[in-house]
Every structure is written in C-alpha cells, then in structure tokens.
Amino acid sequence: FYQSVLGGNFESGFHYFEDIPGAQIPDEEKRRIMHVNLIFSPDQQIMGSDSMPSAGHQIHMGNNNHISLGVDSKQQGKEFFEKLSEGGEIESPYQKMFWNAYFASFKDKFGVSWMINYNLKENEE
C-alpha cells in the first residue's frame, strides 16, 4: 500500500526474521519482516520492521508513534495526504499553518499515525 502511494523502490527487497542464521524464531514469527527500506526520492526513505512478541515487544496501536514526511512541494504533500488518509481518521487536514508551512496529521486505514509537512519557500503561499 505505502509503495503505491509514495512510489519508489524497496532497496534489497524484504528481509525476514527466518533469514537470520542460527536464530531460534517461533514458527508464527518467521515470516515477519526484519528489515525493509522504501526509497521514494533521492533524499527520502522509510525503513521498517515488524514487532516480535517473543522478544518482549508489546504492540499498542494508536498513539505509540507518528511517521513524519517532509515533502518536496505543496502539491506532493496534498497528494500524499489524500491517498494516505483515505479510509482513516483525519486529526488536522492539510492546510497552511502559522509556522509558514502546510501540515496535516492523521491515522491511515491501518491505524498508523502520520504527519506531513511542507515548509513554504520565500514568497510562496
């Protein structure tokens, strides 16, 4: 889903916990993602990993984190906001803010919290 919105490519594919040599991984966790890196512009990437309950990770969906995207243009921010927030919950719509930027915050349809920020350039509205 995220690649379809942001574009880009997965660097080196997906690495799974079952790929760790000699690791004792419970069967139900072997196909969880150990590392993935989505590069969607020369200066922007998102890296991710699944949680591992067997390692003591406790998942608390909701306000446990936000992914923040700094975007290249006002239009790119609007497009990312519209696509990522569809079916989710909008906290703050994509709009001009007092700190001279366009900003939005929301949860996507998977419950992941996002912030999108575009800093306006001089003489840009």
Which stretches of residues belong to each language-model region?
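Glyoxalase I/VOC metalloenzyme domain signal
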Residues: 1-92, 105-125
